[in-house]
From Swiss-Prot:
A zinc finger (C4-type) spans 57-72. Keywords: DNA damage, DNA recombination, DNA repair, Metal-binding, Zinc, Zinc-finger. Residues 80-175 form the Toprim domain. May play a role in DNA repair. It seems to be involved in an RecBC-independent recombinational process of DNA repair. It may act with RecF and RecO. Gene3D superfamilies: 3.30.60.80, 3.40.1360.10, 6.10.250.240, RecR Domain 1. GO terms for biological process: DNA recombination; DNA repair. NCBIfam families: recR (TIGR00615). Coiled coil: none annotated. One of its GO terms (molecular function) is DNA binding. Belongs to the RecR family. The lineage of its organism: Bacteria, Bacillati, Bacillota, Bacilli, Lactobacillales. This is Recombination protein RecR. SMART domains: TOPRIM (SM00493). Pfam families: RecR_C, RecR_HhH, RecR_ZnF, Toprim_4.
Length: 198
């Protein structure tokens, strides 16, 4: 169906979001058009503010509105462990269970030979630099249980083991192919408690 240009553009914009198909984008567009001007302005203001005010922590790579982020600034956290995750949503998932009290490092992707993504294409160099100047004795790899997650964890293990840093992986309470951000709290707690050395 042909829609007026402003609606078509709005549908196109919504459909660019991950997991949003044309039907959902159309629903969102029509819902937005039906909102009050104040609500639309508030939505647009919040969207622009998030885009403008958020950046990545210069230490761990987590999404933050201050640099360094609150987690890196918190001296009460266990400075001897770093949990490596794919993206900031995984940090939120781990923080929500309140079981892990160490530091984080966000990779912003995974090594994916099939997609041409190598170690230099993700946030690994800053991890190596960070480990040189720290008291970290254990790195916990918490990448998703996928082929790319496994490739990334094995690479990290190969690079860090010669430096004498213990490298562990979350236990396999997580189903193969599953994403950490969608795992329930009990599964994540057990995965941390029963992590295995790589």
């Amino acid at each position: 169906m042909l829609y007026p240009t402003p609606i078509a553009k709005l549908i196109d914009s919504f459909s660019k979001l991950p997991g949003i198909g044309i039907k959902t984008a159309t629903r969102l567009a029509f819902y937005t058009i039906g909102m009050s001007d104040d609500d639309v302005n508030e939505f647009a203001k919040n969207l622009l503010a998030a885009k403008r005010e958020l950046s990545y922590c210069s230490i761990c790579g987590n999404l933050t509105d201050e640099d360094p982020c609150a987690i890196c600034r918190d001296e009460s956290r266990d400075q001897s462990t770093i949990l490596i995750v794919e993206d900031s949503r995984d940090v939120s998932a781990m923080e929500n269970i309140q079981e892990y009290h160490g530091l984080y490092h966000v990779l912003h992707g995974l090594i994916s030979p099939m997609n041409g993504v190598g170690p230099d294409d993700i946030n690994l160099k800053s991890l190596i630099t960070r480990l040189m100047d720290s008291e970290v004795s254990e790195v916990i790899v918490a990448t998703n249980a996928t082929a790319d997650g496994e490739a990334t964890s094995m690479y990290i293990s190969r690079v860090l083991k010669p430096a004498g840093i213990k490298v562990t992986r979350l236990a396999r309470g997580l189903a193969v192919g599953s994403d950490i951000e969608y795992a329930d709290e009990v599964t994540l707690i057990r995965a941390i408690e029963n992590r295995t050395e790589l």
